[in-house]
């Protein structure tokens, strides 16, 4: 990890490595500074929502190149979010069509440490 990375960011990456992967809800529950805002992570082209209710610092963390080099997103079951106690009340993306969905869908996502 780069020396310029904030310690709290290193703590999140260390936690994800320790537990083998975590949802945005789990990370928000564990590290309160990631949530509590009105920011959203989304993929506008296919009209997919990844997570919402994030703080500006949380979005900066997830969008940081150094973080993205270490953590890898992947789709997961919505049941992991139910277990974490936070879900989005919207349709879940299953198989995004070419050109994306007409109405935005939620893609439950977890982060894990990249191999290598």
Kindly label every feature range from the protein language model.
Residues 5-13:
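Short, leucine-enriched amphipathic alpha-helices that occur as contiguous helical runs
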Residues 17-25, 36:
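Short capping segments at the starts of secondary-structure elements
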Residues 19, 68-69:
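Alpha-helix C-caps/helix-loop-beta hinges
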Residues 67, 77-116:
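Short, amphipathic alpha-helical interaction segments positioned at domain boundaries
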């Amino acid at each position: 990890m780069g020396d310029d990375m904030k310690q709290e960011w290193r703590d999140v990456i260390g936690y994800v490595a320790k537990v083998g992967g975590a949802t945005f809800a789990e990370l928000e529950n564990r590290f309160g500074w990631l949530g509590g805002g009105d920011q959203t992570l989304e993929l506008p082209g296919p009209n997919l929502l990844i997570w919402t209710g994030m703080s500006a610092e949380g979005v900066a963390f997830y969008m940081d190149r150094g973080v993205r080099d270490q953590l890898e997103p992947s789709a997961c079951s919505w049941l992991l979010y139910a277990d974490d106690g936070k879900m989005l009340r919207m349709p879940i993306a299953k198989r995004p069509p070419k050109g994306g969905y007409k109405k935005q869908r939620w893609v439950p996502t977890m982060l894990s440490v990249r191999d290598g």
